[in-house]
């Protein structure tokens, strides 16, 4: 069975058992009345069952309802169908004040019907020939308004300075100021120039997201013809059907696939209603993507440490034990489905590097947009500063130093012999984003 954990807030006067049973019925075989065609099938075989209810600690009228769905209710290899069944109608139920899907357990038999990520973590490292450290990226800013030629120039400067990747922002598609084909050409030129100068393999996430699946695949085909290593997709705004189609194309044609989670906070930000991001992350691993944005813990975007690390492990590891302290409601066995690299992005700069290296470890992408392009000397020195800071943190960690405690000191030491890093340290020494996380356990 697929198991689901729902956070249920019933209307006053509705007992939790009734609310849990209503959720199970509405998201499987039930309707509001008895119908004569019920007799033509075995409802016992197909209905969802609410098998356990527990109160939420510290909340007066909230309960966790556990529901089991028989596997026969779902089409194989279709995240779209899985979500249509489990969260399709039930969230508008009048008997509930609010409903949130906290976690899913996907059984191995169902996991096996998905291709998953086009390549996965190890194949990506082999393609890029980069080992033993997190990968470094940068989102090109301003996100909208640059011409293709100036955009390509910014890409080249960042890659030449020492970054592994640069990135289209999620809303860069094909607008009047910069058509997609022009952008692809100038970015490919920047890639090859930077590769020739540095001797390292470089990538730029070319955003293939489009208004139709056919147009999206057309853009991915053009990227492949240019010989670039990676394309990008906005998986929630583009939809799971489009995402899975692109993931299959990427595996067949040797392209890596970077996934942006634009629109996720509309779905996952409210604590008592919606879908938790750990569910969206699991769905993405099934649908397919080699990278996905996962929050930073330390930057400008929402994300509490233990909860973030919970779904980061769900993205990367093959087997994850149930651990309620990290918000993981079920043990999940991915039966060797390739892993996804978490991408830390949003309001981070060189002073965050020790914390990011310690929190996310080697299998991650650390993405500094403003933290590269905001360097007072320009893009390339900004990239140099980030690369020096990262190499210093990785070396210190490998020597057994405690990054959490000695992080600032490690960065200061490195800045003595890197003027680029020293300038970056000076610019961002006072910048903090300190707000309480909304998403707590």
From Swiss-Prot:
Gene3D superfamilies membership: Ribulose bisphosphate carboxylase, large subunit, C-terminal domain (3.20.20.110), RuBisCO large subunit, N-terminal domain (3.30.70.150)
SUPFAM superfamilies, per the entry: RuBisCo, C-terminal domain, RuBisCO, large subunit, small (N-terminal) domain
Cofactors demanded by this protein: Mg(2+)
Reactions performed catalytically: 2 (2R)-3-phosphoglycerate + 2 H(+) = D-ribulose 1,5-bisphosphate + CO2 + H2O; D-ribulose 1,5-bisphosphate + O2 = 2-phosphoglycolate + (2R)-3-phosphoglycerate + 2 H(+)
Record note on cofactor: Binds 1 Mg(2+) ion per subunit.
Annotated site residues (Transition state stabilizer) in this chain: 300
Amino-acid positions noted as binding substrate in the UniProt annotation, renumbered to this chain: 89, 139, 143, 261, 293, 345
Active site, renumbered: 141, 260
One GO CC annotation: chloroplast
Subunit structure: Heterohexadecamer of 8 large chains and 8 small chains; disulfide-linked. The disulfide link is formed within the large subunit homodimers.
NCBIfam families the record matches: PRK04208.1
Name of the featured protein: Ribulose bisphosphate carboxylase large chain
Organism listed in the record: Polemonium reptans
Gene: rbcL
